[in-house]
Amino acid sequence: MAVRISIGGTFEHSDFDLCLSEPTLVLCDIEGAEEALLDPLKAQGLKAADILVEVHDRFNDGLSEEIAAHFKTSHSVAKINRDVDMSALPDWMETLSDMDRLMALWEWRIGPTTWLWIQARDRIL
């Protein structure tokens, strides 16, 4: 699997062209710069990619909706809000106090963080 994963440095709009030649999942967590990078008008390759992106609405109110609108004709877009599935926690966490459990799960963010699952329509099964 490692040969199929590419992690790089600075990514330009033209770098998304590789998405046109092979199925690609873009995992994007770039602390607010997603607004500038995820623009299918500037990055044509994004039209063929599946994208999972953390959106920082706290820096730019309404950014999730703006990014979703960029992809509405070529992709399906699902919003994933922050939620804790308590049933998925390890058993040992039950031994913690409520405060310790809160501290273990808290991400120290100033506001809620939304993820968008943006799936290319021509790839949806």
Which residues fall in each region the model found?
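Beta-strand secondary-structure signal
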Residues: 27, 52, 115-117
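S-adenosyl-L-methionine
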Residues: 1-35
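Short, well-ordered coil/turn elements that cap or connect secondary structure elements
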Residues: 1-2, 21, 46, 72-74
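Rossmann-like AdoMet/SAM-dependent catalytic core
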Residues: 38, 58-125
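A short alpha/beta connector and helix-capping loop motif
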Residues: 23-24, 34-67
